[in-house]
Amino acid sequence: FNDKFQAIARIYRFMQKHPVDLYLVYAESEGEIFKSFMQKWAQHREMVSKMTDIVRENGLFGLQAEEKMMRWMFASREEKSGKLWKAINNDNVLECQKMESNSVDLVVTSIPFSNHYEYTPTYNDFGHNESNDKFFEQMDYLTPELMRILKPGRLACIHVKDRVLFGNATGDGMPTIDPFSEMTVFHYMKHGFRYMGRITVDTDVVRENNQTYRLGYTEMCKDGSKMGIGCPEYVLLFRKLPSDTSRAYADLPVTKNKNEYSLARWQIDAHASWKSSGNTLLSYEDMKVAGIDKIRHLFRNYEREHIYNYEEHVAFAEELEVYGKLPKTFMAVDPVSKKPWIWDDVTRMRTLNTKQSQKKRQNHICPLQLDIVERLIERYSNKGELVFDPFGGIGTVPYCAIKLGRRGLSTELNYDYWKDGLSYLREAENEVSAPTLFDLMAI
């Protein structure tokens, strides 16, 4: 309905001087679609009429009162659990206040990006704040609880991203960057966490521009001085001091068996990059027939094994464009980092939102990539331990925890996200608990 309505509205919205006859052409099999469309059109007219009456009676100020009437304090806690997980639909501050001290082995979460998004129409929502200062005032109730429930020596891994401030909102006429990640660092340090550093996760500037329109090629050609760069994501690492700081080992260390976890594997994990063969750049002739996934794979292998050459990088991308192989919806040949603290190989499309789309369910606004969560859990927890996400979303963190032999705990305020997450947690538990052929033979 929204798409059809917008298309119709555009016909007479922009200074139309003559009458317009509108014909809706549909097949006999589409009769129900037409019926539904006309029903929604009638509902739209009724809504416009009511809103017009409200404005006439109360003025524009009355709309704020109407919005306030639609917002409420969350007070309908629900809890579901399995053998390996527990998911709670409630305010995370209230839940953390009831948890035992030193009961969580690892915290992995993606906090709301200040007031950038609101996930629920409740006063409890962390996104329902006027400013960064107000957001962190609300966080002041949660962060001390995370410090209390985390075991000594263990980590809180906080996924954040700097925020884009658009020129039409700031009055600057151009987008600028709000250093939200830096504010987050000082917030957690204020509450006693020790800052251990940050992991940088490269983002796709082409995809980002499709969402924000701030790095457009046409605008850059007009004046490159107003252009910034893409915003990477960060995982900020904070540690609760152990009881004994003489050697700073955690009270319950995260240990690795050298027979199972080799030096070679550690070096690869520490560098956060996967080396593979592919010692030649894809030829321009091969490029004509190769799929973009193959081109991308070979390009990244080549970049990791050779000294970076900017002109060669640009030339290769331009050849892709000539052959019609350069996508406009994602970056095919993004820069490959050789730095150990930058993760440039995260599969950005590998989130639980992919499953949400396949099942035609509501997508999460800011999905957390599975790759990031898996690496953090494997690196900073032992098998069988409890991994907690206070901003659970659709259950990414407990889902990964179960898959990796841990236990998962999450809280989430949005009922739809929480409910969708239950199916993923049950699915993960069923997979790891399913008996193998050898188990059945033993029976």
What are these regions (language model features)?
Residues 50-58, 249-253, 432-441:
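Short, flexible loop/turn segments with low-complexity composition
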